[in-house]
Regions:
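The conserved Walker
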Residues: 14-15
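Conserved beta-strand scaffold positions in the cores of enzyme catalytic domains, especially
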Residues: 30-32, 86-90, 113-115
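Conserved glycine(s) of the Walker
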Residues: 18
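Phosphate-binding P-loop
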Residues: 1-6
Length: 133
């Protein structure tokens, strides 16, 4: 991976996969956007396909407005919404969430920079931080 000074980083995966825990640890000294907090700000709790596409666009726009690197953490169930991020981190720690509708719509990524399969990810956080400096 090349040196990146101003990267848009997507941490995505099923609910309960550890996205927020990982993203908060990664986002030290970076802008950080959590989907649940953004939904609260916009009072938008629409989880239909249209609502999820709107949320994906909103999250990407917020990341682009940030100065320097930004970490966004959300399910991002559709592969088409992941392509524009510089670094894509798939939290592939669980095969199913407790939300059956989300399980059905979640598309496995066609490409990701990192695939996290367990909660031992300190080395990946360090690698990303090193590339961003």
């Amino acid at each position: 991976m090349e040196k990146l000074n101003s990267s848009k980083i997507l941490v995505f995966g099923l609910p309960g996969s550890g996205k927020t825990t990982f993203a908060r640890q990664l986002a030290v000294n970076m802008a950080y956007f959590n989907a649940d907090e953004i939904r609260k700000m916009f009072n938008d709790w629409d989880f239909s396909m249209e609502g999820r596409l709107r949320q994906a666009e909103r999250m990407y726009c917020l990341a682009n407005l940030a100065e320097g690197s930004a970490v966004v953490d959300f399910i991002c169930p559709y592969d088409q919404n992941r392509h524009d991020y510089d670094i894509k981190i798939w939290m592939n720690t669980i095969s199913k969430s407790k939300f059956e509708d989300t399980n059905k719509m979640f598309e496995k990524p066609s490409h990701c920079t990192f695939e996290i399969k367990d909660y031992n990810y300190d080395n990946i956080i360090k690698e990303i931080h090193d590339k961003l400096q």
